[in-house]
A protein has these predicted regions:
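Conserved HGGG/HGGXW glycine-rich cap/lid loop of the alpha/beta-hydrolase fold
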Residues: 2, 7-59, 69, 73
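Gly/Ala-rich beta-loop-alpha elbow adjacent to hydrolase catalytic centers
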Residues: 72-76, 80
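Flexible "cap/lid" loop of the alpha/beta hydrolase fold
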Residues: 85-86, 90-127, 131-134
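Conserved alpha/beta-hydrolase catalytic His-Asp/Glu region
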Residues: 108-109, 127-185
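Short beta-strand/loop motif that positions the catalytic acidic residue
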Residues: 187, 193-195, 199
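Acidic beta-to-alpha connecting loop that harbors the catalytic carboxylate
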Residues: 197-200, 225-227
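Catalytic histidine-centered segment of alpha/beta-hydrolase-like enzymes
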Residues: 226-239
């Protein structure tokens, strides 16, 4: 698990913050945020060749310090919930961003999700990850940002650093995800719940449903002018919420 923010703060002074990327994402999804969190000891999780969320959680715990804060984006939020399920005593704070908690739905809804994921995988396997990413990203950012060439290229470049095999493994992990409702009801540490105003993948209502399951009353932060990739779209707004949560 690479360290991404070097500073002079010891473990005794600053609890490490582990940032967990989502599907086909890496350090770049968090990079715009890092300069805005200068006093945090930050590590970024790497899912490697894992093909289940539970395995990703075990991998994170194996490389993590004894106590830590963690923030998970998208699939990374689901990994964060599995980390808390496995080792709640090691988690000091948790942030859930642009994510979900329910398993694959039964019936038509589940079949539709599976078909959509398999269609993207087929494109990645037959035409390449970048071609897939170019189509996928159209639903990943706020509509006003679709013409932001720098942003769109940064996202598709990030996707392209992963292979179609990694995409297949991570899609398998998401299609076989556990129901984390029970985990949410047992979270007794400060929890941040956040999504983008225009997130078409993990909308505001889904995050309010998550917040309602938490034992403590929890506000849902909705980042204006952002979609699913809010850390890359509106890093300053995200950082301000993060700093309030961490402090």
């Amino acid at each position: 698990m690479p360290t991404s923010n070097t500073n002079n703060y010891s473990d005794a002074m600053v609890t490490p913050l582990i940032l967990i990327p989502g599907l086909m994402c890496d350090h770049s999804v968090w990079s715009p945020l890092l300069p805005l969190l200068p006093h945090q000891q930050i590590q970024i999780a790497d899912h490697g060749d894992s093909e289940s969320l539970v395995d990703m959680a075990h991998r994170l715990l194996k490389n993590a310090p004894p106590r830590f804060d963690m923030a998970g984006h998208s699939m990374g939020g689901r990994v964060a919930l599995e980390v808390y399920r496995l080792a709640p005593e090691r988690v000091r704070r948790i942030a859930l961003m642009n994510t979900g908690y329910l398993p694959l739905a039964d019936g038509e809804a589940g079949l539709k999700e599976r078909a959509g994921r398999m269609q993207l995988l087929a494109i990645a396997q037959s035409q390449g990850v970048r071609t897939m990413g170019t189509q996928w990203v159209q639903h990943m950012v706020a509509p006003a940002r679709l013409k932001d060439v720098v942003l769109i290229n940064a996202i598709t470049d990030m996707f392209e650093r992963k292979t179609a095999t990694v995409f297949e493994r991570q899609q398998h992990a998401l299609l076989n995800r556990l129901d984390a409702s029970d985990v949410l009801t047992r979270i007794h540490v400060p929890c941040l719940v956040m999504t983008g105003e225009h997130d078409a993948w993990a909308d505001v209502a889904q995050h309010r449903a998550m917040a309602d399951l938490l034992p403590a009353k929890t506000e849902v932060y909705v980042i204006a002018n952002a979609g699913h990739m809010l850390t890359m779209e509106e890093p300053a707004a995200v950082a301000q919420v993060f700093l309030n949560w961490l402090n």
